[in-house]
Structure formats: C-alpha cells, structure tokens
Regions:
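Conserved anion-binding
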Residues: 1-40, 44-45
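Catalytic cores of alpha/beta
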Residues: 55-92
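Active-site-adjacent beta->alpha loops and helix N-cap segments on the catalytic face
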Residues: 2-5, 46-61, 76-80, 102-112
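Short phosphate-binding/catalytic loops that engage adenosine nucleotides
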Residues: 35-36, 65, 118
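C-terminal helical cap(s) of enzyme catalytic domains, especially alpha/beta-barrels
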Residues: 81-122
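Short secondary-structure boundary segments
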Residues: 1, 42-43, 72-73, 96-98
C-alpha cells in the first residue's frame, strides 16, 4: 500500500503498478472475505528506516478486527516502542535489514519493549 494524492492505494507487481483500489477499503474487504490477519507493508516507508507509517496502520486497525502486523520502516528500537505506544491495536512489528546487518539485536529490542511496558516474550 502506498500514498497517492493523500489516500492509500493498493499497488501490484512489486510496487510498480497502481491498481487504483483504495487500500483501506481493499483490506477491509479482504478481512470480510475471510483473511485472518493483515501484514501491512508501507511502500513509502519500506527500506527508509525512518519509522513505521503510523497513520496508515491506525487507519487499518480502525476497520478490521483481526491481527495487524506492521511492516516497512523500522530503523531502530525506538521505532518499535513508538509503534506499540501509538497504535495499541497493532499486534506485531516486522523488520528485516536492521537485524540482518546487525544494527539491532533481537534481545535488546525485546528488553527495551519490556522496559517500556510493552508485552513481549523474553
């Protein structure tokens, strides 16, 4: 999902093709048709490491009643703390490069989340 003129659009073909579909409505319809969870990747924030797209995540959490997993944008531990504090309806945060390149240790992330009162398995 990516922002286009102030709204969220569904993109296809690796983010190269705008389908013209409203992203929030499309996700709601997917859940209405049986999707059991949503892994929401923001094309705008993916790989940038400036934090998750909190506005998009909140918009999705407001319209679905299944687990929502945030993807795209994590650049450090502080982004996860911000995510879980700002969007209580989000169930998980996903990241890759910060772990692959050794920028963040999973244990350190879990301990910081725990210190901030965020439920995490240690």
């Amino acid at each position: 999902v990516k922002r286009v003129d102030g709204s969220f659009h569904v993109f296809a073909k690796g983010g190269r093709e705008d389908t013209g579909m409203d992203g929030i409505e499309w996700i709601r319809r997917c859940v209405d048709n049986g999707a059991g969870e949503v892994v929401l990747n923001s094309i705008d924030t993916d790989g940038v490491k400036n934090g998750f797209d909190l506005e998009m995540l909140q918009a999705v959490c407001d319209v679905v009643n299944v687990p929502v997993i945030a993807s795209g944008g994590a650049g450090g531990i502080d982004h996860f703390v911000e995510l879980f504090r700002a969007i209580p309806g989000v169930d998980a945060g996903l990241a890759a490069s910060i772990f692959h390149f050794g920028e963040v240790e999973i244990r350190d992330l879990k301990e910081e989340l725990h210190r901030n009162g965020i439920n995490v398995r240690l």
